[in-house]
UniProtKB/Swiss-Prot annotation:
Annotated region (Domain I), positions in chain: 1-64
Region Domain II: start-end pairs: 65-143
Record keyword Signal present: no
InterPro entries assigned to the protein according to its UniProt record, in alphabetical order: DNA_helicase_Holl-junc_RuvA_I, Hlx-hairpin-Hlx_DNA-bd_motif, NA-bd_OB-fold, RuvA, RuvA_2-like, RuvA_C, RuvA_C_sf
Function: The RuvA-RuvB-RuvC complex processes Holliday junction (HJ) DNA during genetic recombination and DNA repair, while the RuvA-RuvB complex plays an important role in the rescue of blocked DNA replication forks via replication fork reversal (RFR). RuvA specifically binds to HJ cruciform DNA, conferring on it an open structure. The RuvB hexamer acts as an ATP-dependent pump, pulling dsDNA into and through the RuvAB complex. HJ branch migration allows RuvC to scan DNA until it finds its consensus sequence, where it cleaves and resolves the cruciform DNA.
Chain residue ranges for the region called Flexible linker: 144-152
Locations listed in the record: Cytoplasm
Name of the featured protein: Holliday junction branch migration complex subunit RuvA
Location (main, coarse): cytoplasm
Record gene name: ruvA
Domain notes: Has three domains with a flexible linker between the domains II and III and assumes an 'L' shape. Domain III is highly mobile and contacts RuvB.
Record-level Gene Ontology MF annotations: ATP binding; four-way junction DNA binding; four-way junction helicase activity
One of the record's GO cellular component terms: Holliday junction resolvase complex
Organism placement in taxonomy: Bacteria, Pseudomonadati, Pseudomonadota, Gammaproteobacteria, Pseudomonadales
């Protein structure tokens, strides 16, 4: 199991990134909550990782904090929740927001996530309630390493944002509308994704 990677950010194409570790490029899929905190390409970064081995592929998932990785592991243990849905949930909600949602048994937020209907949301909340009791006092630890003053380069930011939203399960029309609704100019793709998700979830 690969539990942690430290290297140089080589590429960033939401929701994927490539981390160069001593000349080897690891393709890592990350939730948007981690993507927001990535530094510029060429900067050092440390990720907490989870490896999924399938018959046809080995998939690596990366997270800014250990508690995010633990949440991912809790989610994929649930019936009917695979890595894609787990990342969609974590991209739409911060860890603490999801914990509060489970504590309040509030389905209204979850049903806005792609792939989560009302019945699925209700089942997830019931199954997660007992599992999340220990999370109430669990501190945020091992934050992603980001160099001070790092800035993300903006290249076709709108297209990247739309592509990332589609990869999370949103329909192309929904993704385009959400990005087009953002009024501010000169935003990075990560900031566009963040604002679009806030408007959709």
């Amino acid at each position: 199991m690969i539990g942690r990677l430290r290297g140089t950010l080589a590429e960033k194409q939401p929701p994927h990134m490539i981390l160069d570790v001593n000349g080897i490029g690891y393709e890592v899929e990350v939730p948007m909550t981690t993507l927001y905190r990535l530094p510029a390409v060429g900067e050092p970064v440390t990720l907490h990782t989870h490896l999924v081995v399938r018959e046809d592929a080995q998939l690596l998932y990366g997270f800014a904090e250990k508690r995010e990785r633990e949440l991912f592991r809790e989610l994929i243990r649930l019936n009917g929740v695979g890595p894609k849905l787990a990342l969609a949930l974590m991209s739409g909600l911060e860890v603490d927001e999801l914990v509060r949602c489970v504590q309040a048994q509030d389905t209204s937020v979850l049903v806005r996530i792609p792939g989560v209907g009302k019945k699925t949301a209700e089942r997830l909340l019931v199954e997660l309630k007992d599992r999340f009791k220990a999370w109430e006092s669990m501190p945020a630890i091992a934050t992603l390493v980001v160099e001070p003053g790092s800035k993300t380069a903006v290249t076709s930011a709108e297209n990247d944002a739309v592509s990332a939203l589609i990869s999370l399960g949103f329909k192309p029309q929904e993704a385009s509308r959400a990005v087009s609704a953002i009024q501010e100019e000169n935003l990075s793709s990560e900031e566009m994704i963040r604002r679009a998700l806030k408007g959709m979830v």
